[in-house]
Amino acid sequence: ITAVEGLGIEGPALQLGDPTAPLQIFRSRDVPCAEYDFYAFDAGSVDVYTYVLPTFPLHADRDFRIGENTNTDTKYSVQIDDGALATPSSSHVWFESVLRNCAVNKSTLHIDKPGRHTLRIRVGDPGIVLQKIVLDFGGMKRSYLGPQSTLIE
């Protein structure tokens, strides 16, 4: 994992792995992974928005997909992208992502109980550049680049 200064929406971005590395099975423990702790006050659904740099597939079988699954009671994985685009250069979604300089993807997770949890971002397609993660527990207002970052140390 490499922090790339000035590439993120609000500062540095994370490059998860080497973009020229071969495809990997995302469930493998060897894939690039970033984890973020968060606290949920209630059980229920949470929408996870990932903002990633829009990129073209480097290999024909590459699809920028991460599976969405619950790893344990408190660890969750999300899908970074919606999959391969047959012709990304002519896709409306691709066009909007390039104009915004990020592709915004949404996954919905179910939180079983209140408390501390961990969001795990794992990639089977190394090289994805993660710019921002937003957790919406309900009531988030729509905006072009999402809400401002909240950092609690």
Predicted regions and their residues:
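Extracytoplasmic
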Residues: 1-153
